[in-house]
Amino acid sequence: MANIAVSHIDHPNLPAPSGTGTFIALFFSAWLALVFFLGARGAFVAQRGAPPLALLLGLLGPLTLFLLAYFTIRPVREFILSADLRLIVGMQAWRWAGLGFLTLYTYRILPGIFAWPAGLGDMAVGITAIPVLASLLRKPGFAGGKRFVAWNLLGILDLTVAVSIGALVPILAPNLYGAVTTAPMSQLPLVLIPVFLVPTFLMLHLTALFQSRRLAS
């Protein structure tokens, strides 16, 4: 099994069909441009106490398309299964920038009930991405193990908790935030986090899990 993993990571045996990578790059570019356009028009802003439906749609829409494409479009599935796991894990290291949530809390831009779990969770995933990447480089078969799966599941849990707090607290306890709310997360530039970066990081975790499952089978 380790030999299979080495072959897959160092010399992928599922080369993506020609043009698939270009198509996916264009999709991400168009998605990012759409987020900027809608964000500039205030399309993601919700009334105080109302559910942030536009934000949730912006998060779940691309994620749903990703899953549908994986399970129904073979070239996309092959592209995902041939992606370099080292790059995928390395990109998660950027989540150490969750420190920014704590900075925004310090300046009373975001509430602590959201900023602390979101910030610390992202920082934990970003920092631990380094030893996970080191394990992959040292032993490619690590990708098919339980610890690799657990790390990705924890990364997904962190994002899920942050999104849940941001979405549910304004509905269930609209006065809990006080004067400082999560409203800035629905406006540029912070809106890029829930409707672009969060789904992108979730896609990376899912890609890693799909590959891990294949390697372990």
Segments and roles (model prediction):
Residues 13-17, 45-48, 74-85, 138-147, ...:
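Membrane-interface helix-boundary motifs at transmembrane edges
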Residues 172-192:
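Short, membrane-exposed interhelical loops at transmembrane-helix boundaries
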Residues 46-110:
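A glycine-rich, hydrophobic loop/mini-helix early in the fold
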Residues 58-70, 124-133, 192-210:
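Hydrophobic cores of alpha-helical transmembrane segments in multi-pass inner/ER membrane proteins
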Residues 147-164:
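Hydrophobic alpha-helical membrane-insertion segments
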Residues 28-43:
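Alpha-helical transmembrane segments of multi-pass membrane proteins
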